[in-house]
A protein has these predicted regions:
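Short beta-strand segments enriched in small/hydrophobic residues
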Residues: 3-26, 175-184
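Short catalytic helix/loop segments, enriched in acidic residues and glycine
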Residues: 25-41
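Cap/lid and interdomain-hinge subdomains that line or gate substrate/regulatory clefts
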Residues: 46-47, 104, 109-244
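Short, well-structured alpha-helical segments in soluble
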Residues: 60-73, 90-92, 260-269
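Periplasmic-binding protein-like
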Residues: 73-83, 101-103, 272-277
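Long, internal scaffold/assembly segments composed of regular secondary structure
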Residues: 231-232, 236-324
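C-terminal catalytic subdomain
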Residues: 300-423
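Extended hydrophobic packing segments that form well-structured cores
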Residues: 375-496
């Protein structure tokens, strides 16, 4: 499954014609050197494209509109080498519709005290020009990312790289289409939401299909295709029979293979990138999709259980944002399931009945067939494993009626044994504080979970979408958190 386009980012340098041609020539040379070095760094996940120096209203406006029209342009990086009068930027910024980064840097790292003169001062005015530019962007209330430091520094390049992934998430958000193969679980509140507002705000398209329409696609899959995929399963995963008859076990596995192929063909044909199911509405499906859904998530599809389209879209979004990341540890649909409350060993067991993505697995992955009381179907096959260790984030997008809120929590990890894929987490700053803050914020039991995305990246995405974001981390104090929720509520009510 193709995750994203071949995106690029434009590098636009601001100046003015007050300093003469020689100065402007150096501005252009310096910006080209910066672009070349950024591309050679091996840190940035996407290519940076140099653009000629922006000086006049007309050129700035034309450049930003060309960026809007270029489907491969995922954002513009701006930098003021010299002073650049900000009124020249107003029209271009007004018409610009893509992610924006303000790189507050300068070409030279060190002031040449022994040789400095007015020519050097005029030529290197980022400390001056970037403030002028920053003022107009703030006055126009345009969302942008600001990165400060010398362009050659690794930490600066890493911040640019991080923003690039967020920018791609912003761009790709409007291409996320969720297929609902069932409605929400009856009487459940948190998985509900305004699908029209989600399309207005995020660009998501959420469509429902009768479960038996997709079941027909499953039934249309031929035995040869099913057998070939089952053989792939048996060569790739460990088989845990646990006393079951091998032939009977294999038949259960074959049902999931047929579901995987049928679902994927249905999604590809109708151009969907995420899917939701519900154990209470399975129609002609023989099993609740388990192994099949896990494999689809591994291929990049989003997923939400019990009709949870918001989490399905978020899983897809976060998989997009981590595409091609070196040493990626995985992104998955997840659920807060049960607690360990032993003093000193507090934590949350995160799992779901079946559907946890194997990209987060650590060590061997096995296929098991176990009974499942929900769904009233035959015992489903599923992949089981333990998850990787290390820090991660879990996000919950909720609908508060007047706005969406993204809750972002940081976690740490260890691990027990269960008949489903699992992860065991201690939320920051501790279980009691983290859980209390989560409940106060209205967080769901389903989450979109990732080792490979930072809380800052998800917060930047939320800001670009114009929605509230709250963070639960090592600095969370309940008194302050409750006040933050109250202040946010007032802000979003007044800012309508």
């Amino acid at each position: 499954m193709k995750t994203t386009k071949n995106y690029k980012f434009w590098f636009a340098t601001g100046s003015q014609d007050l300093y003469g041609d020689e100065c402007l020539q150096k501005v252009a040379e310096h910006s080209q050197i910066i672009v070349n070095e950024l591309n050679k760094s091996g840190i940035l996940p996407y290519e940076v494209v140099w653009k000629p120096t922006l000086i006049t209203n007309e050129v700035i406006r034309k450049t930003f509109n060309e960026a809007n029209a270029d489907e491969e342009c995922a954002g513009v990086i701006t930098w003021m080498h010299t002073f650049s009068p900000a009124k020249s930027w107003i029209l271009g910024l007004q018409e610009y519709r893509k992610p924006l980064l303000h790189l507050h840097t300068q070409f030279n790292e060190e002031i040449p005290y022994d040789t400095i003169d007015m020519d050097f001062m005029n030529e290197n005015q980022s400390a001056h020009g970037d403030r002028e530019y920053g003022h107009i962007v703030s006055r126009m209330e345009i969302v942008r990312k600001v990165v400060v430091g010398h362009w050659a520094a690794k930490e600066v390049q890493e911040k640019i790289a991080s923003w690039m992934r967020t920018a791609v998430g912003i761009m790709e958000s409007s291409h996320i289409r969720v297929c609902r193969v069932a409605d929400n679980m009856r009487n459940v509140a948190v998985t509900e939401g305004d699908k029209v507002e989600a399309q207005i705000r995020f660009g998501w398209e959420i469509d429902a299909y009768p479960v038996n329409e997709i079941a027909e696609a499953v039934q249309a899959v031929g035995k040869g295709d099913v057998d070939a995929l089952v053989e792939e399963y048996y060569s790739k995963y460990q088989i845990l029979l646990e006393g079951r008859d091998p032939e009977e076990f294999k038949k259960h596995v074959a049902v999931q293979a047929q579901i995987e192929i049928g679902f994927e063909r249905f999604l590809e044909e109708k151009n969907y990138q995420a899917i939701v199911t519900h154990f209470g509405d399975l129609g002609a499906l023989q099993q609740l999709p388990g192994l099949a859904i896990q494999r689809l998530m591994e291929k990049g599809y989003g997923f939400g259980g019990e009709g949870d389209w918001k989490t399905a879209a978020m899983v897809r979004l976060m998989k997009i944002m981590t595409t091609g990341k070196k040493d990626a540890k995985g992104t998955s649909f997840m659920e807060d399931y049960t607690y360990n409350l032993v003093p000193g060993k507090e934590g949350i067991l995160e799992a779901h009945m079946l559907e946890v993505c194997p990209t987060i697995a650590d060590g061997p992955i096995s296929i098991k067939v176990n009974p499942l009381s929900m769904g009233d179907r035959e015992d489903p096959a599923r992949l089981v494993f333990t998850s990787k260790t290390g820090p991660a984030i879990a996000t919950s997008l909720i609908d508060l009626g007047d706005r969406f809120r993204l809750i972002i929590k940081k976690t740490e990890k260890e691990m027990p044994k269960l008949p489903v894929a699992t992860a065991f987490w201690t939320p920051q700053p501790d279980l009691a504080t983290g859980a209390e803050a989560w409940i106060l914020a209205g967080g769901a039991h389903h989450t979109a979970f990732s080792y490979d995305i930072t809380a800052e990246q998800m917060g930047d995405w939320a800001e670009a979408m114009g929605i509230e974001a709250v963070y639960i981390d090592k600095d969370t104090q309940i008194r302050n958190f409750k006040n933050e929720l109250k202040w946010n509520s007032m802000y979003y009510k007044l800012n309508k």
